A protein has these predicted regions:
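Alpha-helical scaffold domains
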Residues: 1-143
Length: 143
């Protein structure tokens, strides 16, 4: 990362460099509620994740940045599984801001956790439709 920038600032600079206005506009028109949408696609985010490597502190910082679509999608890709607790998993799935975020969270992180089935069961009985969706997605990855 750049020496003068925090890791989060450097990542956001990279998002900006990879931005795609057509994708961003399409997501906004489709109802994406993020304040900031760069329009970076998932293969590009996976490339960024590969370059960064696993980093729990940065993953948590990205997940907390719920106003930016790409931050929320990148976070599960760089969270080390061995540092991700069941309590944190519960918080992340409950705070996932979109279907897309749930998809990435379940595929890239929750689906490979030893407690994935327990999280799926807990989500299934939730009143939240998004958490119920998470349960179904998670079940499809662990079956």
């Amino acid at each position: 990362m750049d020496g003068d920038k925090s890791p989060l600032q450097a990542i956001k600079h990279r998002f900006y460099a990879m931005r795609n206005g057509i994708v961003a506009d399409t997501l906004r028109r489709a109802g994406a509620e993020y304040r900031v949408i760069f329009g970076v696609n998932l293969p590009q985010l996976k490339e960024i994740a590969t370059d960064i490597g696993y980093d729990a502190v940065l993953a948590r910082e990205l997940w907390a940045n719920v106003s930016t679509r790409e931050s929320v999608l990148l976070a599960p890709m760089i969270m080390p599984a061995e540092e991700f607790t069941i309590d944190e998993a519960r918080r992340w799935v409950a705070s996932a801001p979109s279907v897309e975020a749930v998809d990435v969270l379940c595929l890239r992180l929750l689906g490979r956790m030893p407690f994935a089935a327990q999280i799926a069961e807990e989500c299934l009985v939730s009143d939240s439709r998004l958490m119920q969706y998470a349960a179904m997605r998670l079940r499809s990855y662990i079956s």
